[in-house]
């Protein structure tokens, strides 16, 4: 829960180790205090350490959504899987902090629908900073099944119990790097509005040509 002094020294030491390891990497833009650990004095101490040692970077922590008394922990409003209308409500309240989805669009199975509702928020609100898809790649291991086929195996495929079965299969690419159908949607909505418009026009022209070809065939 991040409360009390029992683990404060340990969590600040973890923050220090991460900062010293990664501080010279140009790709590091934001320090994170952790994931799904509520909020309290211990986590606040991590933020204070980051701000003191590296004021050039922001600090992120989602857990304050469960304990607003420690809102100072994070430099941005962060949520997991917030609904588009919830985000809009926040952004329309003239907030002091930008909004970011630290997890969204959980891509398990044939999913990832509705991305449009999130991406279009960026066209309206400068404070909407987008989100991080959960996640990029399935966690799976290639093995030979009972029929002798080489397949990607998940929980339960290795005589392991208990298991979450295919819950680890939530990426936009398979474990071997092959793209899932959802990648088409990601590629489209992550393009610029101008590129999306050009793609729509090209698709409309192709559909019209197909209709003419079909009519001529009849």
Pin down the residues of each PLM region.
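Extended substrate-binding grooves/exosites of carbohydrate-active enzymes
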Residues: 1-218
């Amino acid at each position: 829960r991040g409360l009390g002094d029992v683990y404060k020294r340990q969590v600040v030491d973890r923050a220090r180790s991460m900062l010293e390891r990664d501080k010279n990497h140009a790709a590091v833009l934001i320090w994170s205090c952790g994931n799904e650990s509520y909020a309290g004095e211990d986590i606040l101490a991590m933020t204070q350490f980051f701000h003191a040692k590296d004021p050039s970077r922001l600090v992120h922590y989602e857990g304050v959504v469960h304990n607003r008394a420690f809102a100072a922990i994070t430099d941005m409003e962060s949520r997991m899987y917030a609904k588009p209308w919830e985000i809009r409500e926040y952004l329309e309240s003239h907030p002091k902090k930008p909004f970011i989805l630290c997890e969204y669009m959980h891509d398990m199975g044939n999913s990832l629908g509705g991305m449009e509702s999130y991406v279009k928020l960026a066209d309206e609100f400068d404070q909407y900073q987008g989100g991080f898809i959960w996640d990029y790649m399935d966690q799976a291991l290639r093995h030979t099944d009972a029929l002798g086929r080489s397949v990607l195996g998940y929980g339960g495929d290795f005589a392991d119990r208990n298991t979450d079965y295919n819950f680890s299969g939530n990426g936009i690419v398979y474990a071997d790097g092959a793209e899932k159908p959802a990648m088409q949607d990601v590629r489209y909505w992550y393009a610029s509005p101008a590129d999306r418009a050009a793609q729509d026009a090209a698709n409309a022209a192709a559909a019209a040509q197909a209709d003419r070809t079909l009519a001529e065939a009849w």
